[in-house]
Amino acid sequence: MSLAAYRSKRAFTETPEPVGRVRRSGRTRAFVVQKHDASRLHYDFRLAVNGVLASWAVPKGPSMNPADKRLAVRTEDHPLEYAKFEGMIPPGQYGAGIVMVWDLGKYEPLENQPPEEQLALGKVQIVLQGEKLRGGFTLIQTKNRSMNSGRRDYWLLIKRRDEYADPLWDIDSARFDRSVLTGRSMKEIKEGKPAKPRLGRHRV
């Protein structure tokens, strides 16, 4: 795991995004989903693995409906500090636009296998403990492609059938339009409105 690609794309004198570092202990099992209104609105799904956030761009966002198979495109690893990043990436910078911490929490591997091994094998089975996403999920690589090959690395993000599954899931519902970190809407983040802290938020 490395942050070289992440750092090479960003001018940290211009963007408020964290430089971060690889944490060698690598024991944090946090996850974050960030709603990102850049050139196109999408959601970034990130899992703490080996001291960084393994990351995927999910164009339609995650779903709690097991019938939905969400495309997830692997992107560069991000620092663990990025899990708490919310704000505006300035125009002209990589990923310019609004970033919201849409969900945040912990995860546990479903199989008796470390997440880094599951990731290397192209099938990650986990249980999420977030505010919006809960229960079992599977990330599965669609083709034997590596980011090192220079081609896009396509995966599918699928909700497992359990007590948390919701066949009526609608990610655009007003129930899900606020940050779990600050309580702000995308519009309020863009306008730089102050956070609306509350008790019980997840810590990473």
Region locations from a protein language model:
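A charge-rich, low-complexity, intrinsically flexible signal that marks solvent-exposed coils, linkers
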Residues: M1-V204
